[in-house]
Amino acid sequence: MAAPKKRTSKSRKNMRKSTWKRQAATQAKKALSLAKSIATGKSTIRGVQSNLSDES
């Protein structure tokens, strides 16, 4: 029979949650920056401009 596990402490739970939120915020910031550069036409990523012009 399975034994009950110990409860995760609030501080550990909050640490993990804050790490996840920090990573999510960083990714959101990068995505917004890329979207702005694509919108202004200053993107240095290959194929982005050609893909946008094909769809328009």
Swiss-Prot record:
Keyword Cytoplasm: no
Pfam families for this protein: Ribosomal_L32p
Superkingdom of origin organism: Eukaryota
Location of the region described as Disordered in the Swiss-Prot/TrEMBL record: 1-28
Any GO CC annotation of this UniProt entry: chloroplast
Molecular functions per Gene Ontology: structural constituent of ribosome
Keywords: Chloroplast, Plastid, Ribonucleoprotein, Ribosomal protein
Location relative to the cell: Plastid, Chloroplast
Basic residues compositional bias, start-end: 1-20
Protein family according to the UniProt entry: Belongs to the bacterial ribosomal protein bL32 family.
Name of protein: Large ribosomal subunit protein bL32c
Organism: Mesostigma viride
